[in-house]
Amino acid sequence: MRMQWIWKSRRSLQNVFIRRSSQYHKPFWRRPLPATLLGCAVLGVAAVYFAKPSPIDENYPRSVAKYLHEALYRQKGENNHDFQDAWKAYQSAIKQAESEKMDMESPPVQGIRLQMANLLASAGALHKAWSMYWDILERTSKLPDFLEQRVLIASKLIELSEPLGLQKDATKAADLIVKALLSKQFNGDDEQKSRLFEQSATLYFQAGTPSYAVPLYHEALNLTMANPSCHGLILMNNLATSLLAQTETVDKKHHETLMKQSQSWSQKAVDSYYFAYPKDRNQECHAGCAAAFYTLGQIAERQGNIDLALKHYKNSEALRKDDPYNDGSMLSHIAIDRLDKDAFIKKLDKSSSPTD
């Protein structure tokens, strides 16, 4: 009898199993239990996220924090009213911090002033931003916990020095960066350190001290070796250019050595360009190789080998097809015109000279 009942009930049992198995073929969100668990997890994460106070609320009294939240919100705007409102909110935050008896030389308060300087820079008030960055740098000189921010402020000063024409004044900022990097006090990654070394080296070069730039470009290049890129070609040529520039400031007996070193680095940049797969050569690769060919042309010209100089200049100019507006190709084009004119004038002088 029992077997007969099971046989008669087989259809209903099959339906039960089919319904259960069909649950596992439904999309995840249509399964009752997993969807419920996922919803609870999302709500839990959201609750933890929104319950956790922001760094502003942790580091500032509530009366100061409210102005900072407003300032940061306004700072995201794009019109003048947003900048003005953000500036007023920062000023109110500073006044409120003073009334709350906060130490006005402490990192939190200097952090507010740093945001104000950033706002000035983004609004185009470069001279005011420059002055404020310097003031913060001087006020924080004895704050050990503010070193990384000081390095980044110094980097910002170097960035502003070029449009303001104040490269020589910014060398103190570069000194600070180099000291922090060489003493291993700055904890950025290799890419960030390389960028800071390069930025400082470029400033020293622009300020007329290429001998300071050479070791810094070398440090910047070494930090890129673990992950080679086309930017390495730019650094190699910067090294070559700095070595060549030293011939203008040192005794003539050192000129040949400096030119050989410069030639070696320029040739390394060219070799690296042709070693890379064509598909991997980006705009930086083309610009770096063009600049390296131009430097090789300069060296050959100074050595009196005009034919070789023209060859290098033409190789540089040929890279305009890949990057039409790179500096090396354009300078090479000017150099070719100059050498062609010189050759033409010499030819005229020869033909017009009296013969016996």
UniProtKB/Swiss-Prot annotation:
TPR repeat copies, ranges: 194-227, 290-323
GO cellular component annotations of the record: i-AAA complex; mitochondrion
Organelle transit peptide: 1-20
GO molecular function, a single term: enzyme-substrate adaptor activity
Subcellular location: Mitochondrion
Annotated CDD domains: Mgr3-like
Example of a GO biological process term: protein quality control for misfolded or incompletely synthesized proteins
Alphabetical keyword list: Mitochondrion, Repeat, TPR repeat, Transit peptide
PROSITE patterns: TPR, TPR_REGION
Keyword Hydrolase applies: no
Protein name listed in UniProt: TPR repeat-containing protein P27G11.02
Organism: Schizosaccharomyces pombe (strain 972 / ATCC 24843)
